[in-house]
Amino acid sequence: MPPRSIEEWFYYKLLSSPGFHRFVRKVYRKVNGIKEDPFTDQSTAFQYLYKPTPRQKFKALRLLFWDEMRSTFGFRRRLGDRFKKD
């Protein structure tokens, strides 16, 4: 079910963000005098995943756009052989 208002959408986005949960966890520890556990904020594999630069994203968008334009006007796709069709 979609959110009924923009406030509800922001609420769902906030509750689903890991950064918000890290912040709440830190505040909770400080308020209750709990020492910070070094293993709770371990780095995840997300840090090591491939992150394309804005230039790479633009280049990919440009390639896909022109390939789509070619197919729209009846020409053969150039990128069709680069993707698996299962």
Swiss-Prot record:
Transmembrane segments: none
Cellular compartment(s): Mitochondrion
InterPro entries: Mrx7
Annotated Pfam families: Mrx7
One annotated Gene Ontology cellular component of this protein: mitochondrion
Disulphide bonds in the chain: none
Highest taxon above the source species: Eukaryota
Keywords of the record: Mitochondrion
Main function: Component of MIOREX complexes, large expressome-like assemblies of ribosomes with factors involved in all the steps of post-transcriptional gene expression.
Subunit details: Associates with the mitochondrial ribosome.
Protein's name in the database: MIOREX complex component 7
Organism: Saccharomyces cerevisiae (strain ATCC 204508 / S288c) (Baker's yeast)
